[in-house]
């Protein structure tokens, strides 16, 4: 039963974060609307900017806490039957291979230029 309450608490925290992101978007919309006016209300802009910054910092802190928690409980093992990890490793290896080829071609060009001179 404690597991369910912990899971529900985590879900509620994520819902709160989602609501906070909605507030961030509303603050940004209010600022954009105010900036589109010929004469802007400086105090309103300052209040909205402060609220925006505070909300972003709060969301960042809460998401970091969620990530830390998930890092602690995760075993690090890929899901049985999942090939995501293997595919990602292959993609990264191919990117490293492409990068090595690019650098080798640059070295070859440099050598050719030095030999021409």
From Swiss-Prot:
Assembly and interaction partners: Component of the Mediator complex, which is composed of MED1, MED4, MED6, MED7, MED8, MED9, MED10, MED11, MED12, MED13, MED13L, MED14, MED15, MED16, MED17, MED18, MED19, MED20, MED21, MED22, MED23, MED24, MED25, MED26, MED27, MED29, MED30, MED31, CCNC, CDK8 and CDC2L6/CDK11. The MED12, MED13, CCNC and CDK8 subunits form a distinct module termed the CDK8 module. Mediator containing the CDK8 module is less active than Mediator lacking this module in supporting transcriptional activation.
Keyword annotations: Acetylation, Activator, Nucleus, Transcription, Transcription regulation
GO biological process: regulation of transcription by RNA polymerase II
GO terms assigned for molecular function: transcription coregulator activity
Pfam families assigned to the protein according to its UniProt record, in alphabetical order: Med11
One Gene Ontology term, aspect cellular component: mediator complex
Regions crossing the membrane: none
Name assigned to this protein: Mediator of RNA polymerase II transcription subunit 11
Sequence similarity: Belongs to the Mediator complex subunit 11 family.
The keyword Hydrolase appears for this protein: no
Gene: MED11
Annotated localization: Nucleus
Function: Component of the Mediator complex, a coactivator involved in the regulated transcription of nearly all RNA polymerase II-dependent genes. Mediator functions as a bridge to convey information from gene-specific regulatory proteins to the basal RNA polymerase II transcription machinery. Mediator is recruited to promoters by direct interactions with regulatory proteins and serves as a scaffold for the assembly of a functional pre-initiation complex with RNA polymerase II and the general transcription factors.
N-acetylalanine: residues carrying this PTM: 2
